[in-house]
Amino acid sequence: MQNPPLIRPDMYNQGSSSMATYNASEKNLNEHPSPQIAQPSTSQKLPYRINPTTTNGDTDISVNSNPIQPPLPNLMHLSGPSDYRSMHQSPIHPSYIIPPHSNERKQSASYNRPQNAHVSIQPSVVFPPKSYSISYAPYQINPPLPNGLPNQSISLNKEYIAEEQLSTLPSRNTSVTTAPPSFQNSADTAKNSADNNDNNDNVTKPVPDKDTQLISSSGKTLRNTRRAAQNRTAQKAFRQRKEKYIKNLEQKSKIFDDLLAENNNFKSLNDSLRNDNNILIAQHEAIRNAITMLRSEYDVLCNENNMLKNENSIIKNEHNMSRNENENLKLENKRFHAEYIRMIEDIENTKRKEQEQRDEIEQLKKKIRSLEEIVGRHSDSAT
């Protein structure tokens, strides 16, 4: 069985950009369960270390007693969905495994990786090269198979894998990130197909030496042990995520029921408020109509008041005229009274003068009688 292929340098840049996109999208998914795979508290140690020693272009892979963990794939460096269920519904197709090529070996040999750089290695799970244009929904960790990639069998090259491992393995321990069961199944499928291809290749290839066979058998046992540990860790993490997700759903269901009851209460309250609002609207219309009627009556009363004011002003003018006439009459009365008094005085004066004249006439009559008597006596005496 061949070792899993490594991600090429151009795939490393693509994985880094996908990791930045996923970290930006993960901040917006607070209410959903995290799709990332839970890492164990203690890093899984593998009981071997690949020490690169090259002599005249040959690769010697030896087993060391000091266990140093090689870098394993971190699925969180790839853009994935927010729902963990989608990770188990669309596994990676085996044709996405990049077969070794001669130009890739040259490129990997000329590529100088930084000392502290971590390479994300996924057994039988990598993205296609950049030359293929793939369009799929965002946050989908398992993109559909593009039309340009054929469903071909996996052909792995031991020399290509060894060179890639020697050029990309860091010198320090890294944390182990486990894959979900769907990815393990796809990895098993890819490795089984790789075993079949190896059996077919063994017919034509020369028989390797004893050291290589020992390394292959020990590596196969270690890979089986590592795969079993990864499966157990992945199942445990999946159960934990499942329980957490179910608890989260139950909590959300309870919150939804509470919100639904509160919404029903608010609906009934809204209906009662709507009825009260309709009653208030009817009362408002009645008050508005009453105000309109009162305004019309007020206008009529204002008109009548204006008419009364006009009549009052007319009466006042007539009263002033009558008062002026009364004043004039008083003046005329005084004048008539004076004339009346003068006429009475004139009448009295006239009566007094007539009495004086009558008295004078009586005196004259008396004088005449006395004279007649005197004359009669003289005549008698003469006779």
UniProtKB/Swiss-Prot annotation:
Primary location: nucleus
Keyword annotations: Activator, DNA-binding, Nucleus, Transcription, Transcription regulation
Residue numbers spanned by region Leucine-zipper: 249-277
Biased composition annotated in UniProt, kind: Polar residues: 13-64, 168-184, 213-222
GO BP, one annotated term: positive regulation of transcription by RNA polymerase II
Signal sequence bounds: none
Induction context: Seems to activate its own expression and that of the repressor ROX1 which in turn represses YAP6 expression.
A single MF term (Gene Ontology): RNA polymerase II sequence-specific DNA-binding transcription factor recruiting activity
Residues covered by the bZIP domain: 221-284
Keyword DNA-binding: yes
Pfam family, one: bZIP_1
Subcellular location: Nucleus
Lineage top rank: taxon: Eukaryota
GO CC, alphabetical: nucleus
UniProt-annotated stretches for the region Disordered: 1-64, 83-113, 168-239
Record flagged with keyword DNA-binding: yes
Compositionally biased intervals (Low complexity): 88-101, 185-206, 227-237
Quaternary structure annotation from Swiss-Prot or TrEMBL: Homodimer.
Function (record text): Transcription activator involved in the regulation of genes expressed in response to environmental changes and metabolic requirements. According to genome-wide promoter binding and gene expression studies it regulates, among others, genes involved in ribosome biogenesis, protein synthesis, carbohydrate metabolism, and carbohydrate transport. It may also be involved in pleiotropic drug resistance. When overexpressed, it confers resistance to cisplatin, methylmethanosulfonate, and mitomycin C, and increases cellular tolerance to sodium and lithium.
Entry's family note: Belongs to the bZIP family. YAP subfamily.
Note: One of 8 closely related fungi-specific YAP proteins (YAP1 to YAP8), which all seem to be transcription activators of the environmental stress response and metabolism control pathways and to have similar but not identical DNA binding specificities. Present with 1400 molecules/cell in log phase SD medium.
Protein name: AP-1-like transcription factor YAP6
Organism: Saccharomyces cerevisiae (strain ATCC 204508 / S288c)
Lineage: Eukaryota, Fungi, Dikarya, Ascomycota, Saccharomycotina
Protein's gene: YAP6
